[in-house]
Amino acid sequence: TWSMLQLMWIKKHEPEVMEKAARAMFVKDYVRYQLTGVWTTDHVEAQGSLLFDNINWCWSEDLCRMSGIPISILPPLVKPTDISGHITAEASAITGIRAGTPVINGATDTALEAYCVGAIHENNCVTKLATSGTIYLFRKEAHPDPKALTYSHVVDGLWYTCLATSSAAESLRWYRDTFCKAEFAQELQGGKNTYRTLDEEAEKVPAGCEGLFFHPYLMGERSPYWDTKLRASFIGATAHHGRGHFNRAVLEGVALSIKDNFSLIENTVPIHEVRIVGGGGKSPLWRSIMANVLNRPILKYANDDSSYGSALL
């Protein structure tokens, strides 16, 4: 994401590297290049680079010129569903995959996670509880918004508006690693899953945590505030609050942060339900909190991994 800025940093701080650069690749495209020897990327990935022209559907010569990025190092563009190449004999010898096996181009994790949970129609909505948290709405036309990100989908004719909070499941991981070290050490020795323990304690606490609130701005915040200086905090703590309150406050704080973003799109089209993906969605309690905060049914699917979505393509 935002590869233009990364390439500009390299150009400024490591100019000798940029001078030698012949090809720029996204991570998945590099893996596919090693498998097939073919250098391509997809439009969804390209849009996230900030170097793509959404009007003419190609790399932007103007943006490349303004940023100083040679357009010649950017890969050819193909559809996510297109076959980019085939497994080479060399790759077959290393991986065991049959030589000649076709390899599709693929797309970004977000687009493929949405695809594998059936977000393929207008007005479908998906939320993601991973390191960061997202909420995205699919529509037939692009709706650019200065507070949001806009991408095309892997399904022709669909676009999605993407809004993101920077620390979703990352907030819970930070909380576990910082305040539950003993439990986590036991888990690593074959003991009970720490997240399950935290959920069980949080389930005993009423909604609202009896006045305890958590702001999940551990790494600043993206939408809707776009402020790197925002900071996380627990507010309203009293002697009455126990660990279960703090556990639940983290879950509720993340859900409310996603609600901040959802409020920008929830009244634009009818949204009857929200599909959920990501590791945080494995928690029944967190799903319940999300359903209450968003005031929508939350749909959980057995398979919601981007690799599964790529296989479906």
What spans do the regions from the language model cover?
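Alpha-helix C-terminal capping segments
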Residues: 116-122, 264-266, 293, 313
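Short, acidic/turn-prone active-site loops that include or flank metal/cofactor-
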Residues: 46, 131-133, 302-305
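Short, small-residue alpha-helix embedded
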Residues: 172, 308-313
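Gly/Ser/Thr-rich active-site cleft segment
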Residues: 1-108, 172, 216-219, 247
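A short helix-loop
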Residues: 4, 8-14, 20, 33, ...
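ATP-dependent carbohydrate kinase catalytic cores
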Residues: 51-159, 166-167, 183, 189-196, ...
